[in-house]
């Protein structure tokens, strides 16, 4: 009951704030919409479409069969889970989460394995790390390989820790025998379903980006000067805008690099909500997922700290 009352008061307060600050709302919404339209829609929509199409056809079988001899013993996963690992590390938020959920819905992997995959297979894309982060934001293209390496390495290292939560008795080998061959659709039907699913997902992602862009516009007007607000909380709302904020602050290059690495590994609150949207059909623990992303962010920042101390 208290939570419901707090939600009501929060929404009423937000509504009044929007009424008295229409310029801030318009600016934030426009920034979020343009960011979605120019950078997210043309990049992410094709990946959402093609991954959905591959899951609905037999296309993923070749990927799983090719990569499972390496990934299966290394990560402790079943053969059918190899595709999610590829999506999670190559396609960016929240394609990895959607592939985990879709494979679980299709009966290709168990719910426990899907949740385990989510703990380390839903990451920022390599193009974002090497392009937007190292070149456009940090203006240090020589750090592109390092920016790419640390989040991936941290996620893989943390997977060995998270595995203990999901693999008490290695339950991931059973689902392969339970897969229903009727789940593969004719290409035209699979394409229709994939387009509809991709449109639904990309629209929800855009909605969250607009909401959090408006929120960060209001938060940026607050004149708090403490470390937690300026360097952690405010940039952690939305990743792209947060990195831009950090790069505009008067920070040492070492501290800036450490912070952007941590934020990229965490993904931001906006990415958390996008992920929650993609896994809504699953009974997975979202607080545990948040804890896993925070742990991965700390490991990434530790790698960045060691690198700056040794080579900075």
PLM features: what roles do these ranges have?
Residues 42-99:
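Membrane helical hairpin/interfacial module
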Residues 6-25, 48-58, 163-165, 213-224, ...:
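Structural signal for alpha-helical transmembrane segments and their membrane-water exit/capping regions
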Residues 167-196:
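Intrinsically disordered, low-complexity non-transmembrane regions of multi-pass membrane transporters
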Residues 39-51, 128, 201-217, 301:
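Hydrophobic alpha-helical transmembrane segments in multi-pass membrane proteins
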Residues 108-164, 278-303:
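Membrane-core helix-loop-helix motifs of multi-pass transport proteins
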Residues 74-138, 233-251, 257-279:
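Alpha-helical membrane segments and immediately flanking helix-loop junctions
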Residues 191-264:
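Transmembrane helical segments that form the transport core of multi-pass membrane transport proteins
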Residues 305-312:
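Juxtamembrane boundary at the C-terminal end of a transmembrane helix
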